[in-house]
């Protein structure tokens, strides 16, 4: 279909085009408790055309674009008619001119991921988790997907590759007398070792047990907070948002390369690197669907912004030599062990009901689903209440743990220590 569509669009006098073909093969399994309820297999192909129309206005070169999906069942006449309609749509919304990627050639031999075998391994990992008297698996859904991409454009890009990912969604119930709670656990990865998948669910079992015994969070001023949450990945995405070419071009971020976001700060300096590949990541794509190659690059080094990243259009607007995707990222570990962080009183947040990070204002926080409070003598599980912080203030005094953890496409410090936090809670 992709070659046929390319031949047809060449007949329509467009200035540039890009075609993306994505075939997705998916194995899905749905379990009630540990019993298989349904197994589904799907195989779908989507072909999307992006076309670009240029014109000059008041001495400025402009470019409009439009996109739509096409199907094998469509006739040539129908496709040509829709392409002409797309050209008209593109001409109605013109933006400053930008170039599309050019001259990338990449043809990767299609890998056989043996999806059914991968699914069986994933099932085994979860069935290794045995119910206890108080903690039980309610249900779970598993997805194992292969994606085959073929991308061509009018500037000589012709790349093809395939990749895969796995996803597990598990609901766990925990009962303590008449009190029952439910926890939702969702993870995404690729080829993660079986024991690590099992250990992740067992960890949620332990947290579920503690949640049923949790006391209300007390109101605190100037608390030391340890963030040991799966939301730590989103915490560090703040730095990606601040350096995103689209955010910068549209003036939603004022960040400039060379700015020091931790000038005169105490504690650890943040270093964040983009990685083309990361073991067990579901985002190991050699190219974006724009036809831009992935690469390794440092975005922040010791608190100083080093580079922007982003899509082709906004990178071109900023005058960057090339667009850089953020498939995977790594935040380097800090100077303190978690044990050192726990020597003095703290509130360690394990789960938020919903973690929110506003990269424009730097505000972040959320309602506490499960945390552990250490008063200097004993540790008590707590729930409820919330924290509200600001990144600019938090970066003035912050420590990152020596220990790291991988959360799908990122490796980040397992615990982040921040200070002077106002905790809303029970009086």
At which residue positions do the language-model features occur?
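Active-site bordering "gate/hinge" segments
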Residues: 1-277, 302, 414-427
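Dual-mode signal for accessory low-complexity, basic/Gly-rich regions
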Residues: 259-427
């Amino acid at each position: 279909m992709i070659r046929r569509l390319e031949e047809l669009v060449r007949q329509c006098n467009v200035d540039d085009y890009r075609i993306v073909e994505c075939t997705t093969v998916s194995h899905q399994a749905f379990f009630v408790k540990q019993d298989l309820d349904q197994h589904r297999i799907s195989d779908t192909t989507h072909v999307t055309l992006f076309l670009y129309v240029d014109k000059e206005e008041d001495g400025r070169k402009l470019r409009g674009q439009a996109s739509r999906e096409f199907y094998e069942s469509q006739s040539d006449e129908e496709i040509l008619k829709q392409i002409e309609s797309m050209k008209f749509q593109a001409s109605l919304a013109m933006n400053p001119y930008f170039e599309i990627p050019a001259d990338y050639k990449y043809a990767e031999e299609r890998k056989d991921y043996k999806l059914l075998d991968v699914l069986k391994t994933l099932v085994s990992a979860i069935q290794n988790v045995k119910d206890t008297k108080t903690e039980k698996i309610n249900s779970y859904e598993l997805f194992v997907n292969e994606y085959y991409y073929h991308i061509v454009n009018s500037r000589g890009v012709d790349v093809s590759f395939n990749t895969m990912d796995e996803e597990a969604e598990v609901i766990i119930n925990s009962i303590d007398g008449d009190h029952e709670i439910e926890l939702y656990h969702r993870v995404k990865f690729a080829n993660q070792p079986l024991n690590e998948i099992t250990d992740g669910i067992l960890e949620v079992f332990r947290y579920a047990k503690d949640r049923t015994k949790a006391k209300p969070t007390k109101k605190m001023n100037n608390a030391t907070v340890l963030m040991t949450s799966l939301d730590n990945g989103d915490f560090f995405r703040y730095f990606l948002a601040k350096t995103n070419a689209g955010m910068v071009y549209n003036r939603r971020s004022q960040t400039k390369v060379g700015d020091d976001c931790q000038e005169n700060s105490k504690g650890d300096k943040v270093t964040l690197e983009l990685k083309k590949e990361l073991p067990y990541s579901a985002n190991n794509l050699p190219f974006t669907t724009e036809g831009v190659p992935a690469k390794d690059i440092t975005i922040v080094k010791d608190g100083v912004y080093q580079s922007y990243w982003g899509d082709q259009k906004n990178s071109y607007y900023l005058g960057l030599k090339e667009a850089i995707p953020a498939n995977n990222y790594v935040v380097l570990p800090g100077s303190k062990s978690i044990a050192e962080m726990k020597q003095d009183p703290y509130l360690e947040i394990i789960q938020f009901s919903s973690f929110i990070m506003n990269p424009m204002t730097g505000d972040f926080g959320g309602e506490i689903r499960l945390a552990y409070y250490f008063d200097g003598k004993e540790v008590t599980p707590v729930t409820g209440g919330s924290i509200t912080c600001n990144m600019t203030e938090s970066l003035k005094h912050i420590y990152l743990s020596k220990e790291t953890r991988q959360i799908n496409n990122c490796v980040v410090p397992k615990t982040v220590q921040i200070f002077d936090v106002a905790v809303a809670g029970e009086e």
